[in-house]
Amino acid sequence: MSAAGRALERIERILDHGGDADGVLRDVVAVLHSDYSWVGISFVEEGELVLGPALGEQAVQPTRIPISYENKVVAELGVIADEIDARDRVFLERVAVLIGPYCLVGWDTGGEAWSP
């Protein structure tokens, strides 16, 4: 199994175990950091991106992957590596889909209850 496949399995286990959104996202960032020199999740708050959980040193601009919930961008996954190839992008886009429900900081549910 590829490194991305192993990381995806670990992330799926984290999501299956559940917990509060902050803890889940920190654990996902830690898994990704084993393969990328910097990983961070930025949340859309009042139209601005605000950095949340992150690991590593952000020496250059990261590759950014939008994180959506109900077809609206709610956050962004950023990673830095020597090289990001097409396989990395597919993997990171899959991770973004999986963690979308955990990235609803400031999300207006209109009073409706929600759970990831």
Q: Which residues fall in each region the model found?
A:
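A generic structural motif
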Residues: G56, I80-A81
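Juxtadomain coupling helices with adjacent low-complexity linkers
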Residues: L8-E12, A81-P116
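Core beta-strand residues in small-molecule sensory/regulatory alpha/beta domains
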Residues: S42, P66-S68, I80
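Conserved acidic
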Residues: D20, T63, R87, F91
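A short, aliphatic-rich beta-strand micro-motif
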Residues: Q61-E70, A75
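Helix-loop-beta substructure at the N-terminus of cytosolic sensory domains
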Residues: S2-G5, E9-G52
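Signal-transducing coupling segments at domain and membrane junctions
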Residues: G47-V60, A86-R89, W114-S115
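Sensory beta-strand/linker motifs that couple input domains to effectors
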Residues: K72-V79, P101
